[in-house]
Amino acid sequence: MAHRGGERDFQTSARRMGTSLLFQLSVHERELDLVFLDHSYAKPWSAHPDASSARPTRMLFVTPRRQQENTIESDVPIDVETVTATPAPLYDNQKARSVMNECERHVIFARTDADAPPPPEDWEEHVNRTGWTVAQNKLFNKILKALQSDRLARLANEGACNEPVLRRVAVDKCARRVRQALASVSWDTKLIQWLHTTLVETLSLPMLAAYLDALQTLKGKIPTLIDRMLVSSNTKTGAAGAEALSLLLKRPWDPAVGVLSHNKPSKLPGSPLILIASSGPSSSVFPASRRHRFWQSQLSCLGKVIPVATHLLNNGSGVGVLQCLEHMTGAVRSKVLEIHSHFPHKPIILIGWSTGALVACHVSVMEYVTAVVCLGFPLLTVDGPRGDVDDPLLDMKTPVLFVIGQNSLQCHPEAMEDFREKIRAENSLVVVGGADDNLRISKAKKKSEGLTQSMVDRCIQDEIVDFLTGVLTRAEGHVGSEPRDQDAEKKKKPRDVARRDLAFEIPERGSRPASPAARLPTSPSGSEDLSSVSSSPTSSPKTKGTTVTSAQKSSQIGTSQLLRRHVQRTDAVLTHRQAQVPISSEPVEEVEKEELRVQLKRHHPSSPLPGAKPSKRPKIKVSLISQGDTVGGPCTLSQGGTPEAAGGKPITMTLGASAGAKELTGLLTTAKSSSSEGGVTASAAPSVASSNATPNAIHTLQSRLVATSPGSSLPGAASASSLLQGLSFSLQDISSKTTGLPGSPSPGPAPQATSVKLPTPMQSLGAITTGTSTIVRTIPVATTLSSLAATPGGKPTAIHQLLTNGGLAKLASSLPGLAQISNQASGLKVPTTITLTLRGQPSRITTLSPMGSGAAASEEPNSQMLPSSSQRLPPAP
């Protein structure tokens, strides 16, 4: 009695909860785990390290087995005084009774002559069977027997606590018998029309109500045949009667209509696309079953449903079973790839019935999907049960939900448990009590539990929603955290110079197919962390080079370790490229290294915000490189070379971190040397920024400082000068042990663009097209040699004159043809970066010409050198 009282309390509380009623109908929600209640140290199933990926089985309406007591008492007390209250039904009883008696209230609309008196109770004796054929008598007797059985069931169930459910079961049984009787005459049109007219005119009102209930049930299953049957009566009753009868027979009544209307399923998170794999080749002769259509409409409440149909040529004539399965699998797989190409960020869920569930599982092994739902999974095959060593389904990595019936013939629950233990993927199992392969519960289960099929289907749908919500939430959180982590990584200041570069790492690919969304850039700006991919619009994707912007380089790296990591991680694309730079053979002292480290930390600013609006003014990068005289010629240095081997540590300085701030990057490499000659190089190169829409073209400007005549402003560069106005710079005094700088021209490096070798100085504006379709402009520029002289204080005046207010604008004004290059009509864009490289080298001048990420150096002839009238620059105090 205590158990019944607890069951009654649960039902009462469940009815109060309203919308969450159906989800709490399952047995696993009713039964409390006494171990978890009594023992606080109890752990969940997944706490064990050897726990498999199979989650505990969830039971829906599975009656727990209770062991019978062996001891039988001799005297059993019988309580005859206590009144047992009737348990409240799981649905709205008042509304269920209202729809149950609908046909009885409107039975008058079915009669052809509404004004005629109703037939008496002994109507069967007044039926005139004169002139009936044997087929007519036989058909009439079958229908009458089915209606009499339904009448007896109604009288027996009258007043029961769950009368609507019992009435629904009796009506379904009567409808099945009527359908069998009509099928015995092959649905002969004349015969079934005669039968319907006779029954409507002769049946009593209670029997006619039962007949209308049967027609209402059959109208939802076989509407065409029922409409053919009602043609003769519609002509007699008129338009009004026909319309009323049509509305009455529109859909069968359901006791749980109130509960289902209040418990609407919610949409799944992430707006997934639900693909329904077909269970066989589609055909116009055999359309999809009514139950499959019903489930398709139910799943449409969760998300966008896309049924995948398989069409065979010539209605499948000459096509074997294996070929048909290959066509079905290929159709689903092609649909998955098509959706991935159009909606790469949309999660895809595969759902299938029976054979379609197997197809969905096989497709999930080959292509990336978010989850798989198998309804009525067929575990038994013609070759035996699944789960052998060579079963490809054991390699599944996609989360999968199996929904099977307790009385299923193709899948036993115990065998399904063994199969789930072998699957590597996260999987769950839902067992529907008393259900068959199509998840339809039996009539005995409906009577004992007080359920209808619609309530069971809604509970199954709730289980599917619960499983998919967890999977989609975890997947959405995992994908959504990546761009947030990358943005935070860009904003914060890195503390370790030698930290690993995550942007160049290749993600490990497991046996599960990778998501297409992971292949797309997750940063809002479309660029990777620490790098931006730059290429020409006409260049192929294989020749794209990866460059590091000056702002990111100044804030995150101070040595050539980035280039080393870059080459190691992208050697598959860039192994054919090399870089040649002059190297000093003498080591750098530890004191100088320490000073450079201090200056490096002092001038490190925070890196700019990735989401800030880019400035329209060009950025200026100044590099000052001084090399020793021990360099006899160009030496080959891999990009993975250590900074110590390059003859010193570079110093990177940037002024301004906001979008509109002016930036200055000075790169200094010091080394012990006794040379008296060097080189001065100025080059202008725009930086390349890649965006989500279309990448900007690469336009490189290289200028030569030819120390022959005093610098003067040229009238053709007014627009370029206006671009650089207002830029103010300052450079901290740099302690150096280098010697004087002669005015020898040399093409400077453009670290953010593509350059080519220039054998001779060009005296006019020229264009050279490289292998990657990049335009290179070479502009000769005149300047004075006296500007490179040293001041009495020992500070290089050339740098100060170049970097003071207006000095860089004068330099831009001295670039001929810059206005023509920046002209929008010519198809080229305004330069975004001007790179100035001041290099001091021995008599043999070496040119660094980057080519994408790697570069090939070219040696300038001695004829390009100016008269040796260099002046020494003493070291700064």
Swiss-Prot record:
One of its GO terms (biological process) is chromatin organization. InterPro entries: AB_hydrolase_fold, KANL3/Tex30_Abhydrolase, KANSL3_1st, NSL3/Tex30. The keyword Glycosyltransferase does not apply. The modification Phosphoserine is found at S523, S536, S540, S746. Residues 551-561, 860-877 have a biased composition (Polar residues). Its main location: nucleus. It is found in: Nucleus; Mitochondrion; Cytoplasm, Cytoskeleton, Spindle pole. Residues 478-561, 599-618, 670-691, 735-757, 843-877 are annotated as: Disordered. Keywords: Chromatin regulator, Cytoplasm, Cytoskeleton, Microtubule, Mitochondrion, Nucleus, Phosphoprotein. GO terms for cellular component: histone acetyltransferase complex; mitochondrion; NSL complex; nucleus. Residues 478-511 have a biased composition (Basic and acidic residues). It comes from the Eukaryota. Residues 523-550, 680-691 have a biased composition (Low complexity). Component of the NSL complex at least composed of KAT8/MOF, KANSL1, KANSL2, KANSL3, MCRS1, PHF20, OGT1/OGT, WDR5 and HCFC1. Non-catalytic component of the NSL histone acetyltransferase complex, a multiprotein complex that mediates histone H4 acetylation at 'Lys-5'- and 'Lys-8' (H4K5ac and H4K8ac) at transcription start sites and promotes transcription initiation. The NSL complex also acts as a regulator of gene expression in mitochondria. Within the NSL complex, KANSL3 is required to promote KAT8 association with mitochondrial DNA. Required for transcription of intraciliary transport genes in both ciliated and non-ciliated cells. This is KAT8 regulatory NSL complex subunit 3. It comes from Rattus norvegicus.
